[in-house]
Amino acid sequence: MLYKGDTLYLDWLEDGIAELVFDAPGSVNKLDTATVASLGQALEVLEKQHDLKGLLLRSNKAAFIVGADITEFLSLFLVPEEQLSQWLHFANSVFNRLEDLPVPTLAAVNGYALGGGCECVLATDYRLATPDLRIGLPETKLGIMPGFGGSVRLPRMLGADSALEIIAAGKDVGAEHALKIGLVDGVVKQEKLIEGAIAVLRQAITGDLDWRAKRQPKLEPLKLSKIEAAMSFTIAKGMVAQTAGKHYPAPMTAVKTIEAAARFGREEALNLENKSFVPLAHTNEARALVGIFLNDQYVKGKAKKLTKDIETPKQAAVLGAGIMGGGIAYQSAWKGVPVIMKDINDKSLNLGMTEAAKLLNKQLERGKIDGLKLAGVISTIHPTLDYAGFDRVDVVVEAVVENPKVKKAVLAETEQKVRPETVLASNTSTIPIGELASALERPENFCGMHFFNPVHRMPLVEIIRGEKSSDETIAKVVAWASKMGKTPIVVNNCPGFFVNRVLFPYFAGFSQLLRDGADFRKVDKVMEKQFGWPMGPAYLLDVVGIDTAHHAQAVMAAGFPQRMQKEYRDAIDALFDASRFGQKNGLGFWRYKEDSKGKPKKEEDAAVDDLLASVSQTKRDFSDDEIIARMMIPMINEVVRCLEEGIIASPAEADMALVYGLGFPPFHGGAFRWLDTQGSAKYLDMAQQYQHLGPLYEVPEGLRDKTRHNEPYYPPVEPARPVGSLKTA
């Protein structure tokens, strides 16, 4: 053994070839600060071996290196800019030493090589991959850019266009594509990986392969003519401006850095990467996006822990077909859980099967599946008008019309047709779980399972714990949701549960703005372009359905009369009374017509202004800041109340539910991350300016306490250790 660290070791393999093996404790390798330092120490040993002829890098895990240790990011990003810059210089000196070894080097890459893992293998001369490889640089999705030389080496290896596509979009690619663009030099079966790697190294050692020529372009300026450079970078900047926009600075910074570094050799190019990375790491956007990643891991980990002793359902059923039922059936079947889809008429069943077939055909058109796979999946969805097969079902979700009498009757009837241990769930969005459970003989086997539309796209499923729901029931439904590829978040029962409960105060803020003379078009524009929502409130109401919102608004007002009962006729009432139900009937705040792809396209409709004039004061202009404050304060206050009342268990789960269920702008990180970034004192000052507007704008006492004690909602993070100690970790 030449060297042994905590996460890697170095040893002789054969005939002058050494192997450097990443083998961290636990299931995966991460390129954390300690591993970077350990890699430096291993290279120090290696540089002294006079009989060294070649070096093989490999992993003892199912994945090569999954990336940097993102749990370290928040503390690293608090280190002063100069110290963070110094540490990056140190880390890059380690990868440069790997790249500068006087012998050929090869990385045998299996599974994942992402982020820092990808940057590590870019420093070797050759890369041999297994067919299951996913390799790429996802840093821009975390609000940063490659910091270990990825923005320097990748363009010099692949050319500007391919590298820009991967870096700016934060993409990873499979083995076949990586081979095609030159990111790897060969693809071999896992069992042949080491043998193949040694064979390539031997060819390089004997001179049959010119490893020096392979290395040289990575050390030099990017080989691009002025015209080629102008075209590549102009197109890339245009695409990034269009897709990322101003709220996500990392992709544009990465493109501009690669452009500026193109005319320099490695050292100067790395300096430019360093100068761009450090300011990005100190942005609120980076902290928010890293926070989302960590919250996602927390939520998924909690679901995994909850279901560790639970068998995933093997057979499911959906009550009620149509678009929603068909979407749920598709998602279950697509992820490998056969499903019975029951309805009371053929027309609805046909609609449900058509929806599932349409979604599968889209997968076929995109080349994700072949005809055989399509036929296999669709055959696991069994449409029926009766209860045949329900005695074999492990879990049933009811998705019939949003009417308590109908739902209770359907659930009670179904309970008689299934085994005693079968779990029943309701996809209700507003009806209290306790009310539905009252119709059942086994309420402990019942809970809420709230999907979001469209089911195949929306990641969140709210699992609602009723007063009598057993832990096992919750765990079984969480297991099914996880198997479906969804992110399940368990909430306690209340009107609207969590997501709808916090959404309707936001809509109430919108209604008050319109009542006071705001133009809905400007409100939408500000909330989309300035705050960052994917849709403004008017457009969102049209998509949800004005009739659906009108009904839900009444339910919420009955549930929370003190805050959500209104004493005036609002825009939702006016549109509902005029039978303008949104996209579903082509008339809402906008008029809708199908575009060339058959998707609804919104158009101005002057008739709306006349309708809204009856429920609003004279038009007046509101500043962007005032619109944002009046829209967001009711939502934020309600989110805080939900945490205080135990409806949602943690800030992390609340923020992920908002991001995954409502499209809360990820660069804000969620309501609690946004609050912590603003500071509760600043938020309180802002909210108090609007408390005259009514109870929705009154800040909860718990948030006032946070302000008095200067406490954040997320645990405080300490800056990482001084950079000098990182070097010798």
UniProtKB/Swiss-Prot annotation:
Q: Which residues are catalytic?
A: 450 (for 3-hydroxyacyl-coa dehydrogenase activity)
Citing just one GO molecular function, the answer is: delta(3)-delta(2)-enoyl-CoA isomerase activity
Q: Which GO terms describe its biological process?
A: fatty acid beta-oxidation
Q: Which reaction does it catalyse?
A: a (3S)-3-hydroxyacyl-CoA + NAD(+) = a 3-oxoacyl-CoA + NADH + H(+); a (3S)-3-hydroxyacyl-CoA = a (2E)-enoyl-CoA + H2O; a 4-saturated-(3S)-3-hydroxyacyl-CoA = a (3E)-enoyl-CoA + H2O; (3S)-3-hydroxybutanoyl-CoA = (3R)-3-hydroxybutanoyl-CoA
Residues that coordinate or bind substrate: 296, 500, 660
Q: What is its EC number?
A: 4.2.1.17, 5.1.2.3, 5.3.3.8, 1.1.1.35
Q: What CDD domains is this protein classified in?
A: crotonase-like
Annotated stretches, region: Enoyl-CoA hydratase/isomerase: 1-189
Gene3D superfamilies this protein is in?
Answer: 1.10.1040.50, 2-enoyl-CoA Hydratase, Chain A, domain 1, NAD(P)-binding Rossmann-like Domain
Q: Which UniProt keywords apply?
A: Fatty acid metabolism, Isomerase, Lipid degradation, Lipid metabolism, Lyase, Multifunctional enzyme, NAD, Oxidoreductase
Which sites bind NAD(+)? Answer: 324, 343, 400-402, 407, 429, 453
Task: Kindly list the GO CC terms recorded for this protein.
Answer: fatty acid beta-oxidation multienzyme complex
- Segment Disordered: which positions? 707-729
What pathway annotation does it carry? Lipid metabolism; fatty acid beta-oxidation
Q: Where is this region: 3-hydroxyacyl-CoA dehydrogenase?
A: 311-729
Role? Involved in the aerobic and anaerobic degradation of long-chain fatty acids via beta-oxidation cycle. Catalyzes the formation of 3-oxoacyl-CoA from enoyl-CoA via L-3-hydroxyacyl-CoA. It can also use D-3-hydroxyacyl-CoA and cis-3-enoyl-CoA as substrate.
- Similarity comment text for this entry: In the N-terminal section; belongs to the enoyl-CoA hydratase/isomerase family. In the C-terminal section; belongs to the 3-hydroxyacyl-CoA dehydrogenase family.
Oligomer status and interactors: Heterotetramer of two alpha chains (FadB) and two beta chains (FadA).
Q: Known PANTHER family for this protein?
A: TRIFUNCTIONAL ENZYME SUBUNIT ALPHA, TRIFUNCTIONAL ENZYME SUBUNIT ALPHA, MITOCHONDRIAL
Can you say what this protein is called?
A: Fatty acid oxidation complex subunit alpha
Organism listed in the record: Salmonella typhi
Organism lineage reads as: Bacteria, Pseudomonadati, Pseudomonadota, Gammaproteobacteria, Enterobacterales
